[in-house]
Structure formats: structure tokens, C-alpha cells
Amino acid sequence: MRLEEYAEGIYVGYRYFDSFGIEPLFSFGYGLSYTEFDIRLCGINTASKGVTVTVEVENTGTTYSGKEVVQIYASLPQDGSRKEFRRLVGYEKTEELKPGEKEMLNIVLPAKAFASFLEEQQEWRIQAGAYGIWIGNSLSEAKLSAGVKVSADVMMEKTKKLEDHSEVVEIKDCAEELCRRAEEWTALLEELPNVSFEPEAEEKKVCRFSEETEIPVEDLIPLLYGNMSEIRSTLGASGIKVPGTAGETSEALFDQYGIPSLIMADGPAGIRLQQTYEVDREKDTVYGTGVLGSLENGYLVGRKDHEGAERYYQYCTAFPVGTALAQSWNKKTDGTVWTEGCGRDGRISY
């Protein structure tokens, strides 16, 4: 299998278009509304853990209510190294606002959002210099609104290189052009609010285990790849504990360490349950249906009843996948859809 080479480097998605001056048809963060909003910067404050931006959002329309997303992007100091022009560092969505109604938002930008990864040093570092804060409801509409100044370099996190991919030829950066653009926006900071920022390195929690509790590597392998010595594949419809799931690791560590098998999700589409399955009580096993049996509720292979088997049914609620929730730009929705929904399902089934 050929190793996928990501030649774009850090210039992924909107960072590529924004850094190389390519105007897309729809800018990152773009969205339609039945009304219009005004976003106004009210204040900017710093602490060791990050920067807090306070904005006021007003529905300036006359007819419809609506919600607005405030997006904050940051431009980093350009020193000739590989960097993007702007990056998303924070966002928040308002409640539903009636025409003329206002809401104040406090958007926290974590310190590490301003850090750059230095390949040679293998560390995340916030570099000294001026940072531009851009505020708007999309990348193309974001306006330079404030400046954040860091007096000295701060290492946020030290990492360790696990694999060398230096042979990957990445696209040529646009450092020279970005340095020119940086001169333009840094000159504009003189007329805008500026604050000093003295970030502190993160306290990284290190999990340590005694020799008595460490599990040998050969015992951990089944957690990732399943029991390859068994005939049953770890791909397809190989779930045992939860029939229909795309994959399951291993029960090999349960008796000795109390570690159960890991149920695999079928990409972003969930765990792909079978609505019905049969159990052989003599062998205490589930009758497998293969990949085709797990698709379209078994329509492709038809229903087959095994003599003496017990049939079970499991019906589940379909929730929006993570990518759909992310597109709402609503942090509250990301959490409540799952927690409240699962809670209601639990009460109903009980």
C-alpha cells in the first residue's frame, strides 16, 4: 500500500486559498441568513492562558430573527519560515436575536492557538512579535480589529519525532509574499487597540505506570489490530459484542487486565448496528452475516433463521455525524445533541 504524501503541508483548506491569494467562490465560514448583523469589538484582554475578545452582535434587520457566528482569525509574525496568513483561533454563535436585539459575547482564544510548530526543534512555540486579530462572520469578511504583542518566545509544548517524512516534497511556500502582507497589516495596528500578552507553557500531564502495571507490547497489539491469528477478519462486519459494527479489537486482555474489546465506528456514519441478529446459546456466539448482511438491513442477502437460535432486535436513534454538527458552528449543539439525546433514549428504553 502506497504511503499517502501530504504535499500541502500546513496549507490545508482555507489556509491555502488565504495564503496564496486565491479567492474561492464561497469563503471559509460563509453562510446565508434572512437578516443582517453588525459585529463590534468592545474589548480585548489577556491572561497567561489566552486572550479574551469581547464583541457585541446586533441584529440590524427589520423583519426576521436569526443567529450570527462571530469568527476570530489571527495573523502570526512572519519571519520567513513556513506559516499561513491567517488561522481560525476562536468562534462563538449567538442566541436567536430579534430585529434590533443585541448580545455580548466573550470569546476565549487559548494560548496554544497562537503557537507555531518548529520542525527542527520539535516543539510548539509562541514566537515574539505582533499578532493581528481579525473579526467577522467569515474569513473573507473578517476585518483587522486589534493587535496582540508578545515580548519573548515561549515554548508551549515539547514533542518527540516518531517517524521521519523529510522525503516528502511539499509545495513551495509563499513566505516572501506573506512577509510583504505582514508589513501592511502590522502598520495598521498603530490605529487599533493593542494589548500585551505573556503566555505560559502548558502543564502537560504525564501518565506513569509502575513495572507491575505495564502491559507487554505483544499483549497490546490485539487492541489495535484484533486477533489476527483467528480466522475472523477485523474488517467488514466483524463486530461480536455489538453485531453489525465495522470492526472489533480483542477480548484477549479482558481476563488478565479487565480491558474489554474496542468497538469500531464505520467512519463518520456511526457504528452501523444490525437491527436484528441471532445468538447460538450452545456456543454462546452470534451468527455472523458478513459485510452484505450488515448493509441495508440485510436486504442484499435476505433473512436466514438458524434452528434453535434466539433472535434479538436493536433499534437506535440516528444522530447527526460530527462533520454536520461542526458545520453549525454551535458549540452548545455539539454537546447537547449527543448527551440529551442519549439521555432521552436511555429513559425510554428503561
Residues of each region from the PLM?
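A conserved hydrophobic secondary-structure block that centers on an alpha-helix together
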Residues: 326-350
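Short, surface-exposed ligand- or partner-binding patches at beta-edge/loop junctions that are enriched
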Residues: 108-139
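Short, hydrophobic/aromatic beta-strand segments
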Residues: 64-72, 84, 117-120
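Second-shell loop/turn segments in exported
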Residues: 205-211, 248, 322-333
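Conserved, mostly hydrophobic/aromatic
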Residues: 216, 262, 330
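Secreted, periplasmic, or luminal enzymes acting at the cell surface/secretory milieu
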Residues: 1-67, 73, 128, 132-136, ...
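Intrinsically disordered, low-complexity Pro/Gly/Ser/Thr-rich segments with frequent PxxP/GP/PP motifs
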Residues: 79-119
